[in-house]
Amino acid sequence: TVVINNYGPSVASDVVLKDVYNVKELFGLQYSLNGNDWFNYNEAINLGNIDVGASVTVYFRAKVNASVRGDVLNTVNITTGVDDARGNFTANETVNVMADTTLVVIKDAEIKELNPGDTIHYIITVTAGGSSDSLNVVLKDILDSTLLDVNSATYAVDGVNKGVWTGSLSLGKIATGNSVTVDIWAKVLSSADRDVFNLVNVTSDEHPEGNTSNATIH
């Protein structure tokens, strides 16, 4: 909310209000002069003349980019056609944006009963939720080298083959509401003599403790 007061001694003519904001932080900026009717903001607002003793209130609203964290600074400037106008023509406000994210990981196996020499196919789905994007998402899945041929294990991300699986993968930013699917293939060793239990852990900036899911192959 921006309030412009004219304390005199003369009418403030041709008053123009400009809102300075970072387009990487805010989008869809709108303004209202009565709190009910909203208009898209386009570079400046022409407020016309403001009489002595009068004030004008301008309301602003905008959506915050889901990747934004921390302080968001917003500045407004006003100009007038009065040559010798005096007063405060700039004001700013800082709002602290706190992340609101959820991160869910689900792990499954295409076939849960295999024999030595068969290939395990793990399917891992990571879903980001909340009002903020999940940042610096990392998936870790350490295969059991006593039961699986870890050196020949391969993986794919969203259906695209990526090569040899090394145990961890940086998924970067996952936009809220989106999912990433990671497939891992590994051959069961001929010497395998027990169930293959496997655990996946997914962390992010907001959830450093991680979320886990597991699958067991018999």
Show the residue positions of the predicted features.
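Exported/extracytosolic protein signature
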Residues: 1-218
